[in-house]
Amino acid sequence: MSQVYFDVEADGQPIGRVVFKLYNDIVPKTAENFRALCTGEKGFGYAGSPFHRVIPDFMLQGGDFTAGNGTGGKSIYGGKFPDENFKKHHDRPGLLSMANAGPNTNGSQFFITTVPCPWLDGKHVVFGEVVDGYDIVKKVESLGSPSGATKARIVVAKSGEL
């Protein structure tokens, strides 16, 4: 299974690294999209993009590297791609799942759960999990608000594959 990372900053100050394990065996197309966006090997990706929506006791959302506000992003496959499967459930904190605008609208936006979110099962594709740096996820979570607005500009300063 691939491992990738984000080096996260808040208002330009480094706060730490989050490492993810991707479920290549269960959702290979979804995992490959995220891996390639972490490396930037296609000429675009997550480096420099914000966590634009952070809701405490729910999730951290990012991955819009085109508009930076939740309206953009794109996949390595060109635009959106279909939901691969819903074999994994949102049953614990630290899961990596695709954000979308309805069925079969996966691009580059993702979220990291901070609680179990069973109401998202069958609607969002879980494709990985945090294996190191969950304390950094919690730091980012503390900078969010019920509306999703963040108290600092939280950015993926650097990302890549381990």
Curated annotation (Swiss-Prot):
Here the cross-link named Glycyl lysine isopeptide (Lys-Gly) (interchain with G-Cter in ubiquitin) sits at: K29, K42, K123, K139, K151, K158
Q: Which reaction does it catalyse?
A: [protein]-peptidylproline (omega=180) = [protein]-peptidylproline (omega=0)
* Cellular component terms (Gene Ontology): cytoplasm; mitochondrial intermembrane space; mitochondrion; nucleus; Set3 complex
Modification type N-acetylserine: residues: S2
Keyword Isomerase found = yes
PROSITE patterns noted in UniProt: CSA_PPIASE_1 (PS00170), CSA_PPIASE_2 (PS50072)
- One BP term from GO: protein transport
Q: Where does the record say this protein resides? A: Cytoplasm; Nucleus; Mitochondrion intermembrane space
Q: Where is the PPIase cyclophilin-type domain?
A: 5-161
Q: Which UniProt keywords apply?
A: Acetylation, Cytoplasm, Isomerase, Isopeptide bond, Mitochondrion, Nucleus, Phosphoprotein, Protein transport, Rotamase, Transport, Ubl conjugation
* Gene3D superfamilies, alphabetized: Cyclophilin-like
Q: Which SUPFAM superfamilies match?
A: Cyclophilin-like
The EC designation for this entry is: 5.2.1.8
In-chain residues carrying the UniProt-annotated modification Phosphothreonine = T71
Indicate the enzyme's highest-level EC class.
Answer: isomerase
Where are the Phosphoserine residues found in this chain?
Answer: S142, S145
Q: Does the keyword Transmembrane apply?
A: no
Q: What else is known?
A: Present with 86000 molecules/cell in log phase SD medium.
The protein's assembly and partners: Interacts with a complex composed of SIN3 and RPD3. Identified in the Set3C complex with HOS2, HST1, SNT1, SIF2, HOS4/YIL112W and SET3.
Annotated function:
PPIases accelerate the folding of proteins. It catalyzes the cis-trans isomerization of proline imidic peptide bonds in oligopeptides. Involved in histone deacetylase complexes, suggesting a function in chromatin. Imports fructose-1,6-bisphosphatase (FBPase) into the intermediate vacuole import and degradation (Vid) vesicles. Regulates the meiotic gene program via the Set3C histone deacetylase complex to promote efficient sporulation, and the prolyl-isomerase activity is required for this function.
Protein name per the record: Peptidyl-prolyl cis-trans isomerase
Q: Which organism is it from?
A: Saccharomyces cerevisiae (strain ATCC 204508 / S288c)
The organism that produces this protein has a lineage beginning with:
Eukaryota, Fungi, Dikarya, Ascomycota, Saccharomycotina
